[in-house]
Every structure is written in structure tokens, then in C-alpha cells.
Amino acid sequence: MLTIEPPSATFPASGGSSTHTITSVNESRMAFKVKSSNNEHYRVRPVYGFVEARGKMKFEIIRLEGPVKDDKIMLQYAEVPADETDAQAPFKAGAQQGDVTILLKTN
């Protein structure tokens, strides 16, 4: 399982960025994929990646200028072998095991 801190973000309508930490509470390596309900106004880095067993990593959400609207980002995850090198592969194979949602607000 993966968790995200902080679990939400608020941006000005003029745009901005927010850094979040993905934490693995598993004894296994995890791959993740980030999806957005609004690809027009949000960008994330990285979109795909790995979190080592009991590890942490940071990712960034960038909001471009746009109208005030509530959105969400979903981080899907799947357990992967230690030697997996393609973070997209488990999702192409339908191996998703769970997801975490980040609520996004603008003001």
C-alpha cells in the first residue's frame, strides 16, 4: 500500500505547485502511475515511478492558470519484482492493486 502526504492541495487560480511524499508501507517494491481528472490545468512529475520497500519519494503537482475548479489526482499502484525496470509495464498488464486520491482545490 502507498500513502501520500499531504493528502490534498490548494492552488491559486493563477497557478502554482505543490510537493507531496509517496510512502510505501509494504515490504515489497511498488510501481505507481498518476492520473488526473483535469489534464488541461495540472501536470505531475513523475507520472510513473517506483517506490522501494518501506521507502519514500517526492512528486510534484503543477497547476497552470485556469478557472476555479475542484479536481483530483489518483495515484494507482502495484507490487513489482525488485528487477522490474519499466514502471509502465504493470499497468499495461492490468496489475493495479490499489489507489490513493489527492483532492485538489483552487481559490
UniProtKB/Swiss-Prot annotation:
Reported tissue expression: Expressed at higher level in testis.
Chain intervals for the UniProt region annotation (Disordered): 1-20
Top-level taxon in the UniProt lineage: Eukaryota
Chain ranges of the MSP domain: 1-107
Signal sequence interval, chain numbering: none
Pfam families referenced in this protein's UniProt entry, alphabetically: Motile_Sperm
Transmembrane feature ranges: none
Cross-referenced InterPro entries: Ig-like_fold (IPR013783), MSP_dom (IPR000535), PapD-like_sf (IPR008962), Sperm-specific_class_P (IPR051774)
Record-linked SUPFAM superfamilies: PapD-like
Name by which UniProt lists this protein: Sperm-specific class P protein 32
Native organism: Caenorhabditis elegans
